[in-house]
Amino acid sequence: STNYDLYKDGLKLVTTIDAEMQRYAEKAMQQHMKSLQHAFYTHLGKQEPWDKEKNLLDNAIRESEVYKNLKRQGLGEKPILAAMNEKKPMTIYSTYQGETEMQMSSIDSIKHYLKILQPGMIAVEPQSGKIKVWIGGLDFKYFQYDQVLAPRQVGSVFKPVVYSAAIEHGARVDAYYNNEQKSYPEYDNWTPRNSNNQYGGYYTLKGALSQSINTIAVQVLLQTGIDATIEHAHRLGIQSDLPAVPSIALGAANIPLREMILPYLCYANNGVSTTPYYLLSIKDRDGRILYESEPPRRERVIPAEQAHTMSSMLSAVIQEGTGKRLINNYGLNIPLAGKTGTTQNQADGWFIGYNPRIVVGVRVGANNSRVHFNSTALGQGANMALPIFGLFMQECLQSNTYAYWSGLSFPVPPTDTQKELAVPTFK
């Protein structure tokens, strides 16, 4: 009932954040984002994102505080734009150098910030639900928009939910599905395509998931049922509204990173859902406890065997699928599972990866989704987000604290399922 001043009353907030792990995460983020931002500038060349998106820059200018302040002073459009085009000394944030003093106009600074790619990253202990890492963006002083909480299109990181629902409803992991491009008359002749535009052959569930085959993800969704898949997603912890359309198989829904990791926490924790939390206690200046967290809610939402099957299938993503650069580029030939995700027009790149002790989610994209790479090779999750996970894991494994992670292993699925998983994934 007492009102406290967070800044003056000497309150002590004890959180679950692991200072060592957070340090490794920030180092990995900064290293990759400098490289990625440079690649983005090189990719754009002389073409600006607003050259084709005419109202992109205009909207950003009119939404700026500078424009609004001048408008409140009674200035008209032309005087406002003239004032905003005047160069003056200002401090801006650069991905390469941090705070930098420059001569720049207000409009130039708006252009600068429009092109900056932002990371979001969260790491959670699946058994306890303790949030160990939280990175909401490049620098909180300049970017208060928290990328971990921002709802964004999720792309293929949603596919494991589709396959998990299918297995729950009786799909066999050794059944083969035709990688054919087809139209769906009942859905306005919607014709999903694969990102590489390659078709043909037959894949098992494991093969289709590891190679992120869109055509088969849609088949699997419709075989299970859209409503049944949505119910399964909600049970695994996703609370966001999911449109009852077949494109959810390809991740058309907008879901925050903090929420999208919840199914993966469930797979890593043997089918038990645990609510992530970050605040342990609040004490006053005399050490009296004002708040103490309750143990997080734990609930079995899928059988342990089903979770083990999903971890086995998601391990194949790393060993032979879209996440294999974790082995090739980062030397992480250890038990890991995960999934890449790339959204429409490469607006966002995702990667969610885990071992039995930690689940890590990463998303990278500009604040405005109309600012993006125009190349799938550069804008895919394996290039945008996965490297942060790879660098982070390297740092952890080189430390005394987390070196033991390299010796961890996932629980094996039941014998019959192991046999199903062992069949060739493509024919």
Sequence positions of predicted segments:
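Conserved catalytic neighborhood of penicillin-recognizing serine enzymes
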Residues: 171-229, 273, 285-311, 315
